[in-house]
Amino acid sequence: MASMGGLHGASPAVLEGSLKINGSSRLNGSGRVAVAQRSRLVVRAQQSEETSRRSVIGLVAAGLAGGSFVQAVLADAISIKVGPPPAPSGGLPAGTDNSDQARDFALALKDRFYLQPLPPTEAAARAKESAKDIINVKPLIDRKAWPYVQNDLRSKASYLRYDLNTIISSKPKDEKKSLKDLTTKLFDTIDNLDYAAKKKSPSQAEKYYAETVSALNEVLAKLG
């Protein structure tokens, strides 16, 4: 109440002066806030400019370094001598053309050209060896080692089929038909023996093994 009374008793000039002082202090406070905000914006703008400037300088330096590296590589380029193609490779000591022959993958596996071609006389000798290996699967049948029976049959039958076709193609026309009939019968019995091994049937395997041996003997007798 005393303060209010003092205000009432104060002169208009005093009140006007106090209002001017208070108003100026408020204006000064708001001005400081604006200046602080502007300074923050200026600092952030300067930081972004510095970052972009550094990135541009880095890209230019990388481009110059890459260009100098390429020039150095081109300057030090050495010619490479290319020699002749390698010699034919294979499993035999004299080397074979087996790995260098074209393969017709559209054909069935048993007809596909993937074995080393031999003259008829050498093909006949290899056919006899393949026939012996097929006959030697009997102990595997007795032990019921069916996967091994199938592996040996398929491996040796592939060689035998290829060599018999070579021999038949070299025979006169009147001998070709009889040999073709015998080979067809032979491979039918081999397929039956393979199927018996797949079914793990000892009785069927014994039956078709005997038929295979008989057919092999007939074919070998024709070969001489």
Curated annotation (Swiss-Prot):
State the tissue distribution. Answer: Expressed in green tissue, with high steady-state mRNA levels in leaves. Not expressed in roots.
Where is the protein situated, by its record's location annotation? Plastid, Chloroplast thylakoid membrane
Q: Which domain of life is it from?
A: Eukaryota
Q: Which SUPFAM superfamilies match?
A: Oxygen-evolving enhancer protein 3
- Membrane topology field: Peripheral membrane protein
Entry-linked InterPro entries: PsbQ-like_dom_sf, PSII_PsbQ, PSII_PsbQ_pln
What sections of the sequence does the record tag as coiled-coil? none
Keyword Plastid belongs to the record: yes
Q: Where is the transit peptide?
A: 1-44, 45-75
- What job does the chain carry out? Required for photosystem II assembly/stability and photoautotrophic growth under low light conditions.
Question: Which family is this sequence assigned to?
Answer: Belongs to the PsbQ family.
The identity of this protein, by name, is Oxygen-evolving enhancer protein 3-1, chloroplastic
Which gene produces this protein? PSBQ1
